[in-house]
């Protein structure tokens, strides 16, 4: 398995926002620690900060522990999903990067990739509890699968794709892996549409991953809980990667009486960052501040 070397996206925007933290010696909660890239930069920028990093992925935690080892006892790593967490004290900043990390996408065994053949898994807690993507598509009726692909993937060909998937399952019993599913989805597109920058299976795989991990439900719980994790004037910053997430973040920051928006519009990657790391092209960064009187 290749090393967990995730490149933090929108790093300059995150560091710029962190200049607003109410005090330099407070607690930073990285709710999606990953390889620790964002946290390492923030700890370097603010030598008095302490970090609690949350991640349910054992590979990510191990990589983060190695990357953050030089910060010693300023760092604590917790094996948990951020939706289940209660912090020991108020934080000056809560950060969440909602994207699937490059190492997760690039390891076939995780089952996230439509470019690399692997088992149809897609669980963030690899090998843990919960339904796999293969089990999900086998369980759902055709119309339910179509609704899921449309609702979570915003896929206009969802009916055709669901019909093809269920027909394949009837004929073969199950898919051999991610490559077979990706091939089936691509076959639902006209030939001209298969040669674009975005792979035809992108939206379907996104929908399955969101459903398997209850990503939107988990995000809703974070948006409800995280403001209470903050001390007055503390920051809540979230990086989202698709419109379903970004709409939720935008709406929460607008309506939550505990928060005041810092970013009126989302910060996106520069052309230079997109060229260096193409996965940043859909990233959006929004920041809000905890109101002192809320």
Swiss-Prot record:
Name the domain of life: Bacteria
Q: Where is this protein primarily located?
A: cytoplasm
Q: What class of enzyme is it?
A: transferase
Where is S-adenosyl-L-methionine bound in this sequence? 36-38, 55, 82, 97, 104
Stated EC number for the protein is 2.1.1.199
Q: Which family does it belong to?
A: Belongs to the methyltransferase superfamily. RsmH family.
What protein name is recorded for this chain?
Ribosomal RNA small subunit methyltransferase H
The upper taxonomy is: Bacteria, Bacillati, Cyanobacteriota, Cyanophyceae, Synechococcales
Q: What gene is this protein a product of? A: rsmH
């Amino acid at each position: 398995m290749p090393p967990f070397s995730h490149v933090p996206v929108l790093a300059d925007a995150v560091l710029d926002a962190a200049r607003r933290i109410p005090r330099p010696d407070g607690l930073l909660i990285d709710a999606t620690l990953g390889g620790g890239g964002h946290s390492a930069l923030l700890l370097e920028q603010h030598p008095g900060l302490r970090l609690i990093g949350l991640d349910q992925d054992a590979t990510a935690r191990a990589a983060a522990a190695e990357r953050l080892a030089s910060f010693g006892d300023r760092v604590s790593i917790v094996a948990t999903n951020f939706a289940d967490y209660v912090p020991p004290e108020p934080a000056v900043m809560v950060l969440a990067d909602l994207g699937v990390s490059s190492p997760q996408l690039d390891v076939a065994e995780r089952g996230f990739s439509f470019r690399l053949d692997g088992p149809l898994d897609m669980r963030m807690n690899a090998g843990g509890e919960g339904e796999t993507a293969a089990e999900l598509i086998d369980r759902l009726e055709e119309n339910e699968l179509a609704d899921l692909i449309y609702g979570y993937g915003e896929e206009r060909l969802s009916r055709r794709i669901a019909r093809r998937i269920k027909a394949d399952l009837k004929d073969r019993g199950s898919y051999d892996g991610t490559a077979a599913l990706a091939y089936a989805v691509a076959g639902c597109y006209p030939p001209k549409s298969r040669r674009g920058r975005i792979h035809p299976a992108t939206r379907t795989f996104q929908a399955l991953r969101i459903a398997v991990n209850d990503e939107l439900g988990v995000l809703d719980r974070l948006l409800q809980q995280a403001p209470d994790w903050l001390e007055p004037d503390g920051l809540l910053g979230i990086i989202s990667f698709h419109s379903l997430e970004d709409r939720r973040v935008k709406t929460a920051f607008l309506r939550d009486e505990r928060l005041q928006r810092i970013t009126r519009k989302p910060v996106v990657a520069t052309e230079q960052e997109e060229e260096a790391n193409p996965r940043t092209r859909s990233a959006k960064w929004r920041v809000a501040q905890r109101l002192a009187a809320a």
